[in-house]
Curated annotation (Swiss-Prot):
The lineage of its organism: Eukaryota, Metazoa, Chordata, Craniata, Vertebrata. It comes from Mus musculus (Mouse). Specifically expressed in testis (at protein level). Not detected in other tissues tested (at protein level). In the testis, localizes to pachytene spermatocytes and spermatids. This is Coiled-coil domain-containing protein 87. GO terms for biological process: cell differentiation; positive regulation of acrosome reaction; positive regulation of fertilization; single fertilization; spermatogenesis. Pfam families: MAP65_ASE1. The gene is Ccdc87. Keywords: Coiled coil, Differentiation, Fertilization, Spermatogenesis. The keyword Coiled coil applies. The keyword S-adenosyl-L-methionine does not apply. InterPro entries: CCDC87 (IPR037383). Residues 23-43, 278-302 are annotated as: Disordered. Residues 287-296 have a biased composition (Low complexity).
Length: 855
């Protein structure tokens, strides 16, 4: 009864306290809601078709929104346009109009389409601003690609993200699930729903490549990848329904009275934790629709719903703190500060704080170690790490059994190198149920195998790869050679190739022969009678190349000359039919002739293959190479030695008149004349110059050197023939290289070029082989002559031994110079002709393309 009596006394006090608050404006009241239409009006709305969400207007809205986004970013207009085009192209190509949901009414379908439209606009802006941020930061942090390459890479990634976050079927499914969840929650809470802002995805505020703050104007832009849940929650409509304002007096009455006599002590953290756990959570989780894997799904944002009421100050414990924004772990629980400190409370010592901190860390470590399997199973540490308690229990037991068996074998000292054989089970038949006429069930068993089995085990090792053509172990040519035996076409092609090589190249050159056939120089009328066949064998021969051909045919019987009829011996007045010996003459002529039976008998004994005759495939006899008779020339006659008193010092170009041979007559003069003739012949054949001839005359005209002259001439005559043969071969090689070493031959037709190159290589090898065989013996002969007589054998005034080492290279060099001279002459003529037409001769002469230029 006492409180009721005090109420009238407190009202004036309340009004006096609340009167100053009337100076402040009250909360803005929302306009009164229009009265709801009756249920009869809902039927006409269902007949009105929903507005289609077409891609054209949607792209215009997206383009307009992106044009006003990210203006502070320091990027060019071309880059902004490129990113905008990527987003719009993705929408134009892959956009699909959402279907009408039959479970929703007309109004909710319209709201769902508005929600989808807002989602597309927000997601496009988020992607656009994020890639603007990457476009600014990537070139600064990684100077690997150029700006254009970086823009291309970002455009490709943006197109992929647009497919995932804008046009993917998962987007519509996730939006529909979120819309239905909010709709159900709104109906459950009576139309009062308060939505919290969606959390940023984890890692949103990670450190960027450039330290903050950026100069890009994108400091509010997250630096990590987006996810579908975050964008869906970002597109939620934040409409807070209004409720009638409470009476201030009732608010004051609801404040509890403080008990000043009771002291507030420290509130233990465990009590707070229990209160938090026991408190019913009004959050409603949403289904997760993320394109990433299940192990990396981000936590969805809960939906909180509570009744609004007047609060003196916001509740900081249930709000969205900075730690939640940064996705940090919750701090360790500490006791809350009491409103009134007790007198008995004392500050904790430092040692106790450290001890409590260590206990908390040990508790966290035990929680982390409890996730893994304990190594108390008796296994070694390495094996224990590889096992898990739940997923590898069977494997763990097998390892324990194996270790136990190994330990028993080690303790017993008996090692069984071969594993125990498992006796195979007898094969059991397999029965198959079969219905016959839908009445009788017959079980058909398979054939039972034999009970015999092998006691020995068989081990077949698989053959490795012989070669791997992908790594370049075998080239294409080697593979073709390995497969040549399996292809019939290759062998046939080789046969035809060999046959065509026998055909003459000039078999189609009809113009090479005589255009007019010469007339015969014999009387053809005398060869028309049959009596001409038995005349002399050399008489009817017109082609002189066939002389002696009949002499090789020994099998042909020779007719008796007395019985051979002759037109010249017959009387002219008698007729041929009136001859009495007519029958005997014809029989004698028919006997040696060949009949048709003889011809067929001859063919039966011969081969039926005439291809070698058609294509002239005769066995070529190996060319008989006559070896140069150099070995017999090695026996050089030693000249008589010079006496000490007769030996005179020879000086080139100086003639000692006192040593000249005196003129005389007799056999000695004829001998000297013979030596002179032989020496002149050597000079002519070896093309010795005049100065060298004069030196030889001066040297060997003395009495002392005259005795060595016959041996010198004989040695030079022995080496003359090999030198001549080598020079002839060298001349053939020079004539051959004049055409074969011409670089212009490479510009001919390919089919002709290959055959020509093969023939050139074959002929060059043949000449080189003959030269090498000859030079090996010729070098030893020349060296011996030079060592015996003290002077070398010369050719054109040059030591032939030195010439053999250089003449091949010199020949190729001078052939090249001759071709250059011809090309320069031809170019000069062409230049002069062009100058005569143009009337200008001030231009420089340009060397042909195949002529190397020298500086």
């Amino acid at each position: 009864m006492e409180p009721h009596s005090q109420e009238p006394d407190l009202k004036p006090i309340y009004h006096r306290l609340l009167s100053p608050l009337s100076l402040f404006p009250s909360k803005a009241k929302p306009p009164p809601e229009p009265p709801k239409r009756p249920s009869q009006d809902a039927t006409p709305l269902q007949s009105i078709p929903l507005a289609k969400l077409k891609v054209g207007p949607l792209c215009r809205q997206v383009s307009k929104r992106l044009a006003s986004s990210g203006r502070a970013a320091r990027v060019t207009a071309k880059d902004r346009l490129r990113l905008t085009e990527v987003i719009l192209e993705e929408l134009k190509c892959n956009w699909r109009e959402p279907p009408i949901e039959p479970i929703l009414d007309y109004e909710n379908n319209q709201k769902l389409r508005q929600r989808l439209e807002s989602y597309v606009l927000i997601s496009s802006e988020q992607l656009f601003v994020r890639y603007l941020h990457l476009l600014v930061t990537l070139p600064t942090s990684r100077r690997v690609f150029t700006e254009s390459a970086t823009l291309s890479r970002l455009a490709v990634n943006l197109a992929r993200d647009c497919t995932v976050f804008l046009t993917s079927p998962d987007v519509y499914r996730c939006l529909l699930a979120d819309f239905q969840t909010l709709l159900n929650l709104k109906h459950a809470q009576g139309g009062i729903v308060k939505l919290r802002p969606p959390p940023c995805p984890p890692g949103t505020f990670k450190l960027c490549p450039i330290p903050w703050p950026h100069s890009t104007g994108l400091d509010h832009m997250p630096c990590s990848s987006l996810n579908l849940n975050y964008l869906v929650q970002l597109s939620r409509p934040y409409d807070f329904p209004s409720e009638p304002e409470p009476d201030p007096v009732e608010e004051l009455k609801s404040i509890p009275q403080l008990k000043s006599r009771q002291q507030l002590l420290w509130v233990p953290s465990m009590i707070k934790d229990k209160e938090i756990e026991s408190r019913p959570s009004p959050m409603v989780p949403l289904p997760s629709h993320s394109p990433s894997s299940e192990s990396h799904q981000f936590p969805t944002s809960p939906v909180h719903s509570w009744l609004q009421r007047g609060q003196s100050m916001p509740c900081l414990h249930e709000g969205w703190s900075l730690a939640d924004e940064l996705c940090l772990l919750p701090p360790s629980p500490h006791p809350l500060t009491p409103l009134i400190l007790a007198s008995e409370s004392k500050p904790l010592p430092f040692r106790d704080i450290v001890a409590e901190d260590l206990k908390q860390k040990m508790k966290i470590m035990r929680m982390e170690w409890s996730r893994y399997s304990l190594l108390d199973s008796g296994l070694p540490p390495l094996l224990g790490v590889l096992t898990r308690r739940l997923t590898a229990q069977h494997h763990l037991e097998k390892l324990q059994q194996m270790i136990k068996s190994l330990q028993e074998e080690e303790a017993s000292g008996k090692w069984d190198l071969q594993p125990p054989r498992i006796i195979p089970l007898h094969p059991q038949p397999v029965t198959v149920a079969l219905k016959v006429h839908d009445q009788v069930i017959v079980q058909v068993a398979t054939v039972q195998l034999s009970e015999r089995y092998f006691n020995d085990s068989f081990h077949v090792e698989g053959a490795g790869v012989l070669y791997n053509h992908l790594t370049g172990e075998l080239d294409g040519k080697a593979i073709e050679e390995m497969d040549a035996d399996r292809l019939v076409g290759n062998t046939t092609g080789e046969v035809y190739k060999e046959l065509m090589s026998r055909v003459s190249v000039s078999h189609l050159s009809f113009e090479e022969g005589d255009q007019i056939e010469p007339s015969a120089d014999k009387d053809w009328s005398s060869y028309l009678a049959s009596s001409f066949l038995h005349q002399d064998k050399h008489m009817p021969i017109i082609n002189r190349n066939l002389v002696g051909f009949y002499s090789r045919r020994t099998s042909t019987p020779k007719p008796v000359p007395e019985k051979v009829p002759s037109l010249t011996l017959l009387p002219r007045h008698k007729s041929w039919d009136k001859r009495p010996n007519r029958h005997g003459v014809w029989m004698n002529w028919l006997k040696p002739s060949v009949s048709s039976e003889d011809y067929f008998k001859y063919l039966s004994f011969q081969e039926s293959d005439f291809l070698h005759v058609i294509f002239q495939m005769y066995e070529k006899e190996a060319p008989v190479e006559v070896p140069v008779p150099v070995q017999e020339y090695l026996d050089i006659q030693q000249p008589p030695p010079l006496l000490q008193d007769e030996e005179l010092e020879f000086m080139q170009g100086k003639w000692d008149w006192s040593s000249v041979i005196e003129d005389g007559s007799g056999p000695g003069r004829a001998y000297i004349h013979n030596l002179q003739q032989r020496l002149k012949r050597l000079w002519v054949m070896l093309e010795v110059p005049e100065q060298n001839r004069l030196d030889m005359v001066i040297k060997y005209s003395s009495n002392a050197r005259l005795q060595q002259l016959p041996a010198l001439i004989k040695a030079w005559e022995q080496v003359l023939k090999p030198i001549q043969k080598r020079e002839s071969l060298l001349g053939r090689l020079e004539w051959f290289e004049q055409q074969a070493s011409d670089p212009n031959r490479f510009f001919q037709k390919p089919d002709l070029l290959m055959n020509r190159l093969l023939e050139e290589n074959r002929f060059r090898s043949y000449l080189q082989r003959k030269l090498n065989r000859m030079e090996s013996n010729l070098v030893s002969l020349l060296e011996r002559i030079e060592s015996v007589f003290g002077e070398p054998v010369t050719f054109k005034g040059r030591s032939y031994l030195k010439k053999m080492k250089q003449d091949k290279v010199e020949m190729l060099y001078w052939l090249q110079q001759q071709r250059r001279i011809r090309n320069l002459t031809q170019a000069q003529k062409t230049f002069r002709q062009s100058c005569t037409f143009t009337g200008s001769s001030s231009q420089a002469l340009v060397a042909p393309g195949n002529t190397p230029t020298t500086h």
